[in-house]
Amino acid sequence: MAKSRYEYVKSFEKDDSLLPNTWMVLRIDGRGFHKFSDKHKFEKPNDKAALDLMNKCAQSIMNEFHDIILAYGQIIVSQFSSNYVYYWKDYLPSKELLYPPSFDGRIVIYPSDNNLRDYLSWRQGTVSSDKNELLFSKFNINYNKLPEMFRKGSLLIHQKIEEKTINQKGLEVTRGKNVVPILHVDIIKDEFWEIHLELGIKI
């Protein structure tokens, strides 16, 4: 109802602006996921298929939004939730999805490369000795013998690779292709950042 006495309500609509020239981290969390994982009988302490499903969702997001250069796993949260339901049967074919999952997202701004690296180090570097003790006492599992996926977490980045293919003339040509690999690596030390200078994060 344009130009009506009710139009004043539009003044309540505010766009939140984020600071430019900063690292914006969108953290997506499952809401009520302890109950969700119990109801769906996820393996404890780690369910590889369920984690692979999460990684696939993050990978799909990065394929859709090319501005995201790195993912460590409001339209994005919505798409993540949709992907989770869509790919459920691909990763957990023997389990019926009893109810849709719920995710929330928050954006945190980090003003420097060091701040971003410290955040990622904190996410990956929760005290391994505490994890070791917990896993051993509850599940008789040695933390140090777990696959990298469970110890390091999953990291996704945009990468350009060269791929050989045959063109319409039957000749072999090399073309660049964008991919989003799922990595399970140490991001606390400098080595990863030295290898991936294309991410633009100073060491």
Language model regions located:
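Regulatory and interdomain segments flanking nucleotide-handling catalytic cores
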Residues: M1-I203
